[in-house]
Swiss-Prot record:
Keywords of the record: Amino-acid biosynthesis, Cytoplasm, NADP, Oxidoreductase, Proline biosynthesis
Keyword Oxidoreductase (UniProt): yes
Pathway: Amino-acid biosynthesis; L-proline biosynthesis; L-glutamate 5-semialdehyde from L-glutamate: step 2/2
Gene Ontology terms: biological process: L-proline biosynthetic process
Family stated for the protein in its record: Belongs to the gamma-glutamyl phosphate reductase family.
Organism classification: Bacteria, Pseudomonadati, Pseudomonadota, Gammaproteobacteria, Enterobacterales
Catalytic activity: L-glutamate 5-semialdehyde + phosphate + NADP(+) = L-glutamyl 5-phosphate + NADPH + H(+)
Entry protein name: Gamma-glutamyl phosphate reductase
Amino acid sequence: MLEQMGIAAKAASYKLALLSSGEKNRVLEKIADELEAQMESILSANVQDVEQARANGLSEAMLDRLALTPARLKAIADDVRQVCNLADPVGQVIDGGLLDSGLRLERRRVPLGVVGVIYEARPNVTVDVASLCLKTGNAVILRGGKETHRTNAATVRVIQKALKACGLPEAAVQAIDNPDRSLVNEMLRMDKYIDMLIPRGGAGLHKLCREQSTIPVITGGIGVCHIFVDSSADIAPALKIIVNAKTQRPSTCNTVETLLVHQDIAERFLPALSKQMAESGVTLHGDETVMQALHGPAKLVPLKPEELDNEFLSLDLNVVVVENMDGAIAHIREHGTQHSDAILTSDMHNAARFVNEVDSAAVYVNASTRFTDGGQFGLGAEVAVSTQKLHARGPMGLEALTTYKWIGFGDGTIRA
């Protein structure tokens, strides 16, 4: 089954690569229109997925990721339209020039070909990834989690209907709707057809892909994100940033999971933090210093060492008091996932040092980690947030779904 999907996807990719920007945008507009027109069928499938997931004991954080509403689906359709407004990188001449030999050389941006994406309970990923791949002239094979298989199947049917209406092969966007996990292992070995693989899920999925895939893999999305409250931080705006980074949408990978507090500000800062977190319903997981300093009003539990490596994806926040900037940077290097980390400070020397020494995909000064997002960065919807350094890093927009080719123009030109 998968080999036939691969053959069809590869054939579709050749046709997509030849489309003009206008032709690709017309497809995306049609997809957005169909998502709204077929909203009832997608939401009906999603209700079944959510009910099944709840019966299976899925956490509230995961249920939030899984659930669609009319407003969320409308926002997804609007995101597709936003992709239409983005500049098409395909065909862009990156650089080039005339060589001494007389050969005119250019480096031109081209589609990757076929992209494979493995993801868990995030139905919006289906549309986000499909729209970005189509905009860049790539075919895509999707493998969502079993929790979303009804939603994904309904969504892909809508996308394929739009493709067909525009005279394009339905195989440009395909989904593996069989929940059999052995198919993941088979997909990882489809290097004959898939040019790049992107896993979006937990550490176990990423480890499996790194170890078993014969396809180039871009991993990311695991966000043990930190905020360091420096000794010179302005407490009121710092609390506002922390509330946003923790509570706006706790189930996302750019949510802060560990707060590092400079010891020189801890006595003044921790009580204010506790009050604010109590109002926000956040449970604090405090180290020994925090446990001794606080006795309410926020719910407070002792921090377990293994929780420093946790991606809670819930209203839980580790709080650790550190001696100085060195301690904060060392902690992030040991426990961070190179996703998003921030410093809250009034000392621009410390800010510069933090930015230079924290090796994460996104580093912030006096701002929330929640900004690590394709839409917020002006990239449109994102296919993933890469925490590695090759071939993309941070939110992966359109350019991350392209490669380049060298093209030489001669006039009977030969090498001397």
